[in-house]
From Swiss-Prot:
This is Lipoyl synthase. Residues 1-24 have a biased composition (Basic and acidic residues). Keywords: 4Fe-4S, Cytoplasm, Iron, Iron-sulfur, Metal-binding, S-adenosyl-L-methionine, Transferase. Its main location: cytoplasm. It holds the Pfam family Radical_SAM. Residues 1-30 are annotated as: Disordered. The keyword Protease does not apply. The keyword S-adenosyl-L-methionine applies.
Length: 320
């Protein structure tokens, strides 16, 4: 872990070569509601050892998630498949950019083994973008889902997928056909900020991906999230909510953007807890089954508990 931190701090240009030419953005001091304790618990160490033992990557580490100490201490980790190197270079993201290695055919089995070792009731599996692959890694996702089902049949599975922008429709169909319990794809920000924040993606393509997943399997829960503090305004966030609901998204997450390095997109401002509470109220008013909107909310934060509440919310709505 220490070696990894040293790598990230000493040679950021190797991790993010596409950002090396950018001027440094001043990182504002974090308010009290953002600060978290350093991970030190035995549970954290046990989770780390299992992940290391299976030679797996986690988005918790690669993206520099502020909740890693809390989640890992409880034995929760978000598996990141298909390597640690992404083919995109989004200005908000701390995952390394470059040329990925070939897929590891044994990775799905190792993920399933780790899920079993950790005793997870709910697992989140995500990935880097793999624009170098014809199917964007869809079959690898499907293999991972099937491996977890075989090894840990009682575990519910959530996938947080890339946009499959350069693939045919069969990529999405492959993932949905593997029957994950939750299909998650993040819109990340308001459409007006895409050219700067998410230049390799297309807002309405991502929105349609979520809509089509629900069309392919109406029983699947769909989920999406955005960050705030990137330069958006409240009306833009409310419009994204409306767009998601038009695509029948069930679960919305909203969290504060935190700038990984001075070369990344600047933090425009820190959104207050009161504003997050306002977003949560507005989202429930628009019909979302489940909403998580706090400064430290991330896609997989408390995902297991939230899935149970999501399932209950659907049952109540169907029974109403």
């Amino acid at each position: 872990m220490i070696g990894k931190l040293v790598r990230d701090l000493k040679i950021p240009d190797q991790r993010h070569p596409e950002k090396a030419h950018r001027p440094d953005n001043v990182q504002p001091k974090k308010p009290s509601w953002i600060r978290v304790k350093a991970p030190t618990s035995e549970g954290y160490k046990e989770t780390r050892d299992i992940i290391r033992g299976q030679k797996l990557a986690t988005v918790c580490e690669e993206a520099g998630c502020p909740n890693v100490g809390e989640c890992w201490s409880q034995g929760h980790a978000t598996m990141m498949i298909m390597g640690e190197i992404c083919t995109r270079g989004c200005s908000f993201c701390n995952v390394a950019t470059g040329r990925p290695q070939a897929l590891d055919a044994f990775e799905p089995g190792r993920v399933a083994h780790a899920v079993s070792q950790l005793g997870l009731k709910h697992v989140v599996v995500t990935s880097v973008d793999r624009d170098d692959l014809e199917d964007g890694g869809a079959e690898h996702f499907a293999q991972t889902i099937r491996a977890i089902r075989h090894r840990a049949p009682a575990t519910t599975i959530e996938v947080l997928v890339p946009d499959f922008l350069k693939c045919g429709p069969s990529a999405l169909e492959t993932v949905v056909a593997a029957r994950p319990d939750v299909f998650n794809h993040n819109l990340e920000t308001v459409p007006g900020l895409y050219p700067e924040v998410r230049p390799g993606a297309r807002y309405f393509h991502s929105l349609r991906l979520l809509q089509r997943a629900k069309e392919l399997d109406p029983s699947i829960f769909t989920k999406s999230g955005i960050m705030v503090g990137l330069g958006e305004d409240r009306q833009g966030v409310l419009q994204v909510m409306d767009d998601m609901r038009s695509a029948e998204v069930d679960f919305l997450t909203i969290g504060q953007y935190l700038q990984p390095t001075p070369k990344h997109h600047r933090v425009d401002r820190f959104v207050t807890p009161e504003e997050f509470a306002g977003y949560e109220k507005a989202a429930y008013g628009k019909g979302f089954l489940m909403v998580s909107a706090t400064p430290l909310t991330r896609s997989s934060y408390h995902a297991g508990d939230d899935f149970a509440r999501l399932r209950d919310a659907r049952q109540k709505r169907l029974g109403a």
